[in-house]
Amino acid sequence: MVPEARPEPTESGHVSKGEGWFVLNARDSRWYAGPGRSAFCDLEGDQDFSQLGININVLEPGVPMAMYHWEADQEDFLVLAGEALLIIEGEERPLRQWDFVHCPAKAKHTIVGAGAGPCVVLAVGARVLSVDNPDWGGYTVDEVALRHDAGVPDDTTKPEEAYSRFTKRQPTAYREGWLPD
């Protein structure tokens, strides 16, 4: 029998502390936010899921979800609300509510908030090859991504280099307006 891993309250929201099944409302979960960065809902808690990464990102207009990158595993995205701009393989694609994006392994991509208000994106990614692996993926120079402030000046595989110009996101409680009613 698989035990319940009931999320525990913290100053920045409820957090799952162990293995097991649980139910958690996104508004009650721990979030991370920082200046010029997307806010994201930490659904996994203190222990990352071993097979699948999942989170909810809230992108203000012009704010990238991530630096332009590729991963050794597939990633998928579903726009839950608002508008965004997908940059994939050096091309731009507008996204709107209920658009689904599939990025097979090695597809270079990022998503940038667009439109008049916040965009909410569900992100899901496999964790077969990318966890604790030096060949997880990388950040590559791309002119389109750079034009949207979502690119790196030099190729790197180190997240700390790709995000060096940003303030690190800090744990926070859900803020009203991040998720649609």
Predicted feature residues:
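A short, N-terminal "cap"/entry segment at the start of jelly-roll beta-barrel domains
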Residues: M1-Q51, L146-D181
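Conserved short histidine dyad/triad with adjacent acidic residue
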Residues: G36-D42, N55-E71, A105
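Short strand-coil-strand connectors
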Residues: S50, I87-E91
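Short, conserved beta-strand element in jelly-roll/cupin
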Residues: I56-P61, H69-I88, A126-V128
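Short acidic-glycine-tyrosine-enriched beta hairpin
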Residues: D76, G90-K106
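Ligand-binding loop in jelly-roll beta-barrel domains
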Residues: L85, A105-D132
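Surface-exposed, gly/pro-biased binding rims or lids
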Residues: A126-E160
